[in-house]
Amino acid sequence: MAALIIALPEEAEGIKGYPIYLSGCGKVNATIATMRAINDGHRFIINFGSAGSVSDITGLVEVTGYVDRDMDARALSCELGQTPFEDGIIIGEHGIVCGSGDKFATSKPEIACDIVDMEAYAIAKTCHKEGVKFRSWKYISDAADENSANDWEENVHKGNSLFQKMLYRGGLW
């Protein structure tokens, strides 16, 4: 059975029939929750949460690629987003790319991405390293701009019902 990793209780409200691991915000917390789920025997991880859009994307979207918007080792001749001594920047594929960072985004990040959050990259990387299947859906709650904090507070709960409709109709596998 798939396990869900969700940052906040309000994003998980009403979801039944799946083990839910509430991670809290940020990449370290997301990694800890992911390892707990994997150590509990889950071989398929689903992430749901809110995200800001730095493009024209709206609604509930499936993320196809993940980048770390905090990683900057250009002084070591790495590309922006590349972890030293590792190949590549993106986990997954181009399409809808999520840039994860430990700073709540109030402006477009320097690294190329379509949406921004605080957890998905860490979950994707952990699953990739551990050989666990992973998929992620994000509800666009704000435009990652100067109004994003207020917009996020107003909209964070709105994606839950859309995600549940998809989850229960079996469209995840």
Which role fits each region the language model picked out?
Residues I5-P9:
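Structural motif
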Residues E11-W173:
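Glycine-rich phosphate- or other oxyanion-binding loops that anchor nucleotides, phosphorylated ligands
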